């Protein structure tokens, strides 16, 4: 082995600069006896990366997560949930796994970040995996349509609050079934985003009924879904959107 190759092998597992794919490609070219050793070491470092990501996530965003680990043949899958267990309460779910598992066991899945980590994110009532197709906010690190800049930041800020969040609708307010002032501004903003069409008078009216949220910026540069996002994507976390353009219709 040349000096250059030795430097590469020594540094490969300390920093994943080349990404998961390049690391596994490098391992596949090693002799058989070395391949298993380095593959085992690489998987351990992936696990350490994942654990560190989750710790930073919990600390940076202030969310009290509960989570468990499912061990599959390659790597780990973490399923995390934030929110109360009270019936009909909204909960924030996050599904994290490494792309090695998806490449081998979900070969047809193409819409995901091939680096680290793979993340799905959704908000719903009930159990984690019930009818999630319509609930996705983020699929594989890509923000879903309908969730504009700042909206994921609002979800994170709301779930940093311990108040119970429900599926509130304009009809419930009109009938007097709920009092919008009961919730803090952050929780109410999230409930409005979840249950009113974008850029409509209904949403604007719902927001006006609740407590006004205090202006804010993200507490750090934690990017939540991926360290590979662009500075423009960082706005999803750091800045909440203004409400002045939420309705463009005519009276």
Swiss-Prot record:
Record-linked Pfam families: Lentivirus_VIF
Q: Which GO terms describe its biological process?
A: viral life cycle
InterPro entries, per database record: Vir_infectivity_fact_Lentivir
Query: One cellular component GO annotation, for this chain's record?
Result: virion component
Which terms are listed as keywords in the entry? Answer: Host cytoplasm, Virion
Q: Where in the cell is it found?
A: Host cytoplasm; Virion
Q: Which family does it belong to?
A: Belongs to the feline lentivirus group Vif protein family.
Q: What role does this protein play?
A: Determines virus infectivity.
- Which protein is depicted? Virion infectivity factor
């Amino acid at each position: 082995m040349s000096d250059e190759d030795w430097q590469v092998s020594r540094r490969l597992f300390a920093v994943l600069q080349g990404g998961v794919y390049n690391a596994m490609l490098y391992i596949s070219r090693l002799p058989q006896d070395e391949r298993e050793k380095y593959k085992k070491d690489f998987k351990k470092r992936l696990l350490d990366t994942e654990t560190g990501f989750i710790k930073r996530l919990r600390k940076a965003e202030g969310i009290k997560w509960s989570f468990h680990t499912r061990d599959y043949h390659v790597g780990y899958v973490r399923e995390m949930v934030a929110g109360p267990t009270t019936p009909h309460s909204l909960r924030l779910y996050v599904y994290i796994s490494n792309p090695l598992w998806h490449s081998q066991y979900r070969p047809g899945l193409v819409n995901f970040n091939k680096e680290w980590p793979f993340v799905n994110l959704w908000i719903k009532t009930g159990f984690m995996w019930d009818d999630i197709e319509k609930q996705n906010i983020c699929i594989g690190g890509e923000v879903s349509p309908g969730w504009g800049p700042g909206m994921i930041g609002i979800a994170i800020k709301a779930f940093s609050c311990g108040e119970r969040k429900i599926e509130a609708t304009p009809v419930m307010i009109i009938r007097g079934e709920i009092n919008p002032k009961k919730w803090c501004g952050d929780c109410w903003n999230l409930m409005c985003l979840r249950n009113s069409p974008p850029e409509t008078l209904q949403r604007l009216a719902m927001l006006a009924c609740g407590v006004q949220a205090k202006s804010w910026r993200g507490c750090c540069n934690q990017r939540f879904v991926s360290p590979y996002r662009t500075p423009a994507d960082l706005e999803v976390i750091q800045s909440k959107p203004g409400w002045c353009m939420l309705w463009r219709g005519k009276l």
